[in-house]
C-alpha cells in the first residue's frame, strides 16, 4: 500500500463502517451528500437517494457529519496505551 493512503483508507473505512453521513466537496465547488457505500484506489461510491461514483481526483474535501475515530490499536506505536478519559 502506498504511504500516502495510510490515513485515507482507515478514515474512509471508518466512515463506511459506521455509516456516518458525509459532505463531499468537489474541486469545482459542488457539494455532494450521502454515506460512503464503498471505495477503492480511484473512486468513492456515495449513496443517497441514488448511488454516485465520485472520482477521488475530483474531490477537494470530505466532511463527516460527526467526529470519527479512525485509528485502530495497530496504528499506535508499540507500547503506547490508548488515552483514558478522566473524570473532573
Curated annotation (Swiss-Prot):
Region described as Disordered: 66-88
SUPFAM superfamilies, sorted: Sm-like ribonucleoproteins (SSF50182)
HAMAP family: Hfq
Gene designation per UniProt: hfq
Basic and acidic residues: bias regions: 72-88
Pfam family, one: Hfq
One GO CC term on file: cytosol
Record's keyword annotation contains Acetylation: no
Protein name (record): RNA-binding protein Hfq
Family to which the UniProt record says this protein belongs: Belongs to the Hfq family.
Organism per entry: Aliivibrio fischeri (strain ATCC 700601 / ES114) (Vibrio fischeri)
Domain Sm: 9-68
Gene Ontology process terms (BP): regulation of DNA-templated transcription; regulation of RNA stability; regulation of translation, ncRNA-mediated
